[in-house]
Amino acid sequence: MLFRSVHHIVARFSNSTSTPIHRFFYSPSLLRRRSSFNASLISRCCSSVSDVDVARDAVVKIFSFSREPNVVQPWQTTEKEYSSSGFAISGRRILTNAHVVGDHLYLQVRKHGSPTKYKAEVKAFRYGCDLAILGIDSEEFWEDINPLELGGIPFIGETVYALGYPRGGDTISVTKGIVTRVEPQKYSHSSIKMYVYTSGGSTNKFYSGQINKKIYDGR
């Protein structure tokens, strides 16, 4: 959305092994529908420019391939490619939006600064909070990737950085903003009310799955 204030969906998760993933997510086969809503994920990060550079290396570009019917000749289908963003978390996993992967034939993921694409699989999935976890079975992919830690929630007036892949671009973008509003709003996929953050500042039109980073103690 090309508004000065862009809405960002908030999701809180724990990296603790005592909290099983299945408590938050459903199987990928339960819900499969696509949405044009560009959602975002909130986590905390570190304060210096060098720390933002480290965080940038954890952000990946996701390529989703699907088949869509021809409206004129519905017996024919066409393969479509979509791209979005995600980021590495603990356990060799990628966190992104559910609507990014909800109707895919196959997925590929590319690291920042690399031309190589790696096959990815959906490991956990839930439209209620519009989040999905991907797995990548490649030792090479996980080399030199420092996963991000999911931390607390930023407050109004605090600085955040939006990292992702804007539409029409193939390189990662970093945008600085200020949290200007926090309020519950309906998610476009489930119509469930959850907290949504508004950040002010100059923003690009981001692909889904981007990360917004609060500057705080390496999270």
Swiss-Prot record:
InterPro entries: Peptidase_S1_PA. GO terms for biological process: proteolysis. Pfam families: Trypsin_2. Residues 1-45 form a transit peptide. One of its GO terms (molecular function) is serine-type peptidase activity. Its EC number is 3.4.21.-. Coiled coil: none annotated. It is found in: Plastid, Chloroplast. One of its GO terms (cellular component) is chloroplast. It is an enzyme of class 3 (hydrolase). Keywords: Chloroplast, Hydrolase, Plastid, Protease, Serine protease, Transit peptide. Putative serine protease. Belongs to the peptidase S1B family. PANTHER family: PROTEASE DO-LIKE 10, MITOCHONDRIAL-RELATED, PTHR45980. This is Putative protease Do-like 6, chloroplastic. The lineage of its organism: Eukaryota, Viridiplantae, Streptophyta, Embryophyta, Tracheophyta.
